[in-house]
Amino acid sequence: MPIIAVISKNNCQFDDLENYVLPLLYQYHDETTRLQLKNKLNDYLWEIIEPYVTFINCQSDIFMETICTHLVKEFPDKKLDDFFYHTESSFSFPKKHTELMYCQPTWSYQKDQEVNMNFIGCLFSLKHNVIENTCIVIANNYDISTQNNIVIGDVTKNDILRMVRRRYFFSAELIKNDTITKYYYQNPGYLVSKVFDLKEQDTIEKLTVGFLKYNLSFYCNQNKNQYVNKIATRINGLYQLYGDVLVLNEMDEHVYTNLSTHELRRLNVLAYGRLYDRQLKADEIHEESHVEVDEQGKEIEKKKTPLWSKYIIIDKRMSEWQNNKNKCFYCNKNIEKPVVCNKCFRIKYCSEKCQSEYNSYHSDDCINPKSITN
């Protein structure tokens, strides 16, 4: 039975949040220290929000009825038909995406009264809608074996905490040699200056590349006297990058979202191959219909690609990669000792002979020669 989270109306305020968030930001932590700091933050958040969060097991055959019944519990004298019901996408994660459900009375009702506010629900509304009374969080797990690629899943305590945290800071990844390290931040510019120890007059190189619905921003000094960053070069696919490289996921101009170590590692292995293969196939483009109301009050149906669709693309490609990860790009035989292109680091061969025979085809797809050390 799927588990939903029922969020009662509340006036939750996180007055001491800075004391728990600031120690996490803009600096390197080993995994043990980072988990300790996150657990302290989680304990603080949960102590405040726990009285308003209830997890409910829903029978599949009365799933929507159960949801609607809990949404209208503040109005025991009203019927289910006395409300408009709204569903909007909320935060998405590598294994699931969440939706927020709430209702709106159809009768004359005074909105925006503080006594009816659901402040946790307001945090979860990415459309910045004002959420009143009870709201509900639903989880959708990605499942590429199903027709729609998603199935109703369980909402957990960890999901709720992650959703709250997402409102206050993001994660980026630093690629240093062959390791990937997580950094937390609120201000991306300040993170870049801290990681690279920039002074006021210093500059930094930025390269933005789209890859499988991610919009990755690579920051580096691009000093060719430093080592070639193989992982960053492989993932961006276009230029050799040098030294330590900081990677952020910039959804839109100055709009950032999380980039986890797990996600970047998966992008790293999926970066092997031709640049042409990065293009999305027709069956990989997932669109959902939604209704908008124009200035004349007319409803218009539009199609939109949801942000979480990139996780389904990645899951499908990882499944394909598992079957081909040890194959020579040229002859398709199993690789015992890989020979990797030492410029783009994207193409693997089983022998130098295969590399030589494919070289004339690969040269146009390889790295930009202007970025290579002389």
Curated annotation (Swiss-Prot):
InterPro entries recorded: Znf_MYND (IPR002893)
Alphabetical list of SUPFAM superfamilies matching this protein: HIT/MYND zinc finger-like (SSF144232)
Pfam family, one: zf-MYND
Binding locations of Zn(2+) 2: 341, 344, 362, 366
Ranges annotated as MYND-type zinc finger: 328-366
Amino acids binding Zn(2+) 1: 328, 331, 350, 354
Top-level lineage group: Viruses
UniProt keyword list: DNA-binding, Metal-binding, Zinc, Zinc-finger
Gene Ontology terms, MF aspect: DNA binding; zinc ion binding
Protein name: Putative zinc finger MYND domain-containing protein R331
